[in-house]
């Protein structure tokens, strides 16, 4: 059985001891990273979340501690009392923060023993993610994982400090709410007290934060858990954390300005980086035209160019068909890549096809000639204008896609990113922020044969576009904004509708009958009757923001206990079956 502390108190963290502590008597506690036996001396590397300190056990200093340490192995939990000693110059270890000192142990308590762990507790450990997730409590002992979670904590601390300083109030909203599915599926919770009725777990605190604005809390925030029963996708979690913010009596500009200051403070405090503000801004339309996506990575160029007008009269069938079907012809210039081998060009063609393109036209620009499968279909004048539009020089490779706009944009956006990586055009140490604004308010869902909200049904249309809501819904722009960092959307929000009549019109355009709208959102519509201020806000994905700041490859590395890509917890084996008795209490029958 492990020993008890019996009043022994920790005086210092392992990684915080320095030469200033020499000759002090200290008590440290932690896990054994490594044990080395040098005959008359035993060396223990003791680890806690702050780092490692070397502890020396000598028979001459304490025969009792020296005898006891013989049984100690990796991951044993120890409490050690001893004296801090300066290391001899030749024994200094510059790789650790405590490398100039060591502790000579007087007392040793073995608080807990450990079996041999299934993998080494070190960052170099080459172990599968499945094993790491099964033994997550061991994985979290690794320095990189501890650093990730400490950085995540630092982000939330900066957010809280900044918002508190700026007059915001942290308010919690319910986790058991009414199901109002619009977008992803709700997680449902059966009510035992009301058989046949269900709560939903919140996909976001959206409606409640709007109700808080109507309640008079004009500056709200919350670090909120959100849950969405989404189809399985790479790097998505069924539960995730949002930095949720809402403000009253504001317009778009007010929301963007305070959020820029907050983001700048987060990056200053966590990475020591000065982020220039204000951030760049692109309209949704401009972002799509220039980068093929509303999540552009601005760390490199290779922008899309529209060639449709140049080839409008072309006899080339590929171009002709695309333009006839209201599509477009667009291209990018891969500087200095003209000599790309045919095999790699063919790979790019196949890559383009995975995004729905029927093909990919390439043009190699050399000093004295232009090589392309399309030379025989394009006139000399057309080719000349294409080269001019794409600012082609000798040595460049031009890639062109002709199809429906959505396919052209999607294909070229992915090609641009792929080639940016291949040719090392992306500076990994750069942070490029951009606000994407003026989103379309609505999209048309071919499957459901109705208009759906691009963001959510409470987003306000731009004032000048309100009159188009019923006549030309797809032309209506929203007072919505996303914040994109290095090609990843880290947050998004909007100014909300605060007028009952406008909200009714919005529901009608979305195909909700008045009855259906009241059934789902009646409590919000009722609240609007009693004086709602203009309000708006934003929500950030904390997991994704932490992933970028820590330089992690996946959001699972910045969440303490994540699910797998299949939404399973390998450590606790959730989700799991429950007993018949539990189901009976809830009046539920499982029909598989």
Curated annotation (Swiss-Prot):
Binding positions for L-aspartate per the UniProt entry: 182, 228, 455, 496
Signal peptide stretch: none
Keywords, in A-Z order: Aminoacyl-tRNA synthetase, ATP-binding, Cytoplasm, Ligase, Nucleotide-binding, Protein biosynthesis
Residues the UniProt record annotates as site (Important for tRNA non-discrimination): 38
Enzyme Commission number: 6.1.1.23
Recorded catalytic activity of this chain's protein: tRNA(Asx) + L-aspartate + ATP = L-aspartyl-tRNA(Asx) + AMP + diphosphate
Annotated spans, Aspartate: 206-209
Entry superkingdom: Bacteria
Gene Ontology biological process terms from the UniProt entry: aspartyl-tRNA aminoacylation
Function: Aspartyl-tRNA synthetase with relaxed tRNA specificity since it is able to aspartylate not only its cognate tRNA(Asp) but also tRNA(Asn). Reaction proceeds in two steps: L-aspartate is first activated by ATP to form Asp-AMP and then transferred to the acceptor end of tRNA(Asp/Asn).
Subunit: Homodimer.
Protein known as: Aspartate--tRNA(Asp/Asn) ligase
Species assigned in the record: Thermoanaerobacter pseudethanolicus (strain ATCC 33223 / 39E)
């Amino acid at each position: 059985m492990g020993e008890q502390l019996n009043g022994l108190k920790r005086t210092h963290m392992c990684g915080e001891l320095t030469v200033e502590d020499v000759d002090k008597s200290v008590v440290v506690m932690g896990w054994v990273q490594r044990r080395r036996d040098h005959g008359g001396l035993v060396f223990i590397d003791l680890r806690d979340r702050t780092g490692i300190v070397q502890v020396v056990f000598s028979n001459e200093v304490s025969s009792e501690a020296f005898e006891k340490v013989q049984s100690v192995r990796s991951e044993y939990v120890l409490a050690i009392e001893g004296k801090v000693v300066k290391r001899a110059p030749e024994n200094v270890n510059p790789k650790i923060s405590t490398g100039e000192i060591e502790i000579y142990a007087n007392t040793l308590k073995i608080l807990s023993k450990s079996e041999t762990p299934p993998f080494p507790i070190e960052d170099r450990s080459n172990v599968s993610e499945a094993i790491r997730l099964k033994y997550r409590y061991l994985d979290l002992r690794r320095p990189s994982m501890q650093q990730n979670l400490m950085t995540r904590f630092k982000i939330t601390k900066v957010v809280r400090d900044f918002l508190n300083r700026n007059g915001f109030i942290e308010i919690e909203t319910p986790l058991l709410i009414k199901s109002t599915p619009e977008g992803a599926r709700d997680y449902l919770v059966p009510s035992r007290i009301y058989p046949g009725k269900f709560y939903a777990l919140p996909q976001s605190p959206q409606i409640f934060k709007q109700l808080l604005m109507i309640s008079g809390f004009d500056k709200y925030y919350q670090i909120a858990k959100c849950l969405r029963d989404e189809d399985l996708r790479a790097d998505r979690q069924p539960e995730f954390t949002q930095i949720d913010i809402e403000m009253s009596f504001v317009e778009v500009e007010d929301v963007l300005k305070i959020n820029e200051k907050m983001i700048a403070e987060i990056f200053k405090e966590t990475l020591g980086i000065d982020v220039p503000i204000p951030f760049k801004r692109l309209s949704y339309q401009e972002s799509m035209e220039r980068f093929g996506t509303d999540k552009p990575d601005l760390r490199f160029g290779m922008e899309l160019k529209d060639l449709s007008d140049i080839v409008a009269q072309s006899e080339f069938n590929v171009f002709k068909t695309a333009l006839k079907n209201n599509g477009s012809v667009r291209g990018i210039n891969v500087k200095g890549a003209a000599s790309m081998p045919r095999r790699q060009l063919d790979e790019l063609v196949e890559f383009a096809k995975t995004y729905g393109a029927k093909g990919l036209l390439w043009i190699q620009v050399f000093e004295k000639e232009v090589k392309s499968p399309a030379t025989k279909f394009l006139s000399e004048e057309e080719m000349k204008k294409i080269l001019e539009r794409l600012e082609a020089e000798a040595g460049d490779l031009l890639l062109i896609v002709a199809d429906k706009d959505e396919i052209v944009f999607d294909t070229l956006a992915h090609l641009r990113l792929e080639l940016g990586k291949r040719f090392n055009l992306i500076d990994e140490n750069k942070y490029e922020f951009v606000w994407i604004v003026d989103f379309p308010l609505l999209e048309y869902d071919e499957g459901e044969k109705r208009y759906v909200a691009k963001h959510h049904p409470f987003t306000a249309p731009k004032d000048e576009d309100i009159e188009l809501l019923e006549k030309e819904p797809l032309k209506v722009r929203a007072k919505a904004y996303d914040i994109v960092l290095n090609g990843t959307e880290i947050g998004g929000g909007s100014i909300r509708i605060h007028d009952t009549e406008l909200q009714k019109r919005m529901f009608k355009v979305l195909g909700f009958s008045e009855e259906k709208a009241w059934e789902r959102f009646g409590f919000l519509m009722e609240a609007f009757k009693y004086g709602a201020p203009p309000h708006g806000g934003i929500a950030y994905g904390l997991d994704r923001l932490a992933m970028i700041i820590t330089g992690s490859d996946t959001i699972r590395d910045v969440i303490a206990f994540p699910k797998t890509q299949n939404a399973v917890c390998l450590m606790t084996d959730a989700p799991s079956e429950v007993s018949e008795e539990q189901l009976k209490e809830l009046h539920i029958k499982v029909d598989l």
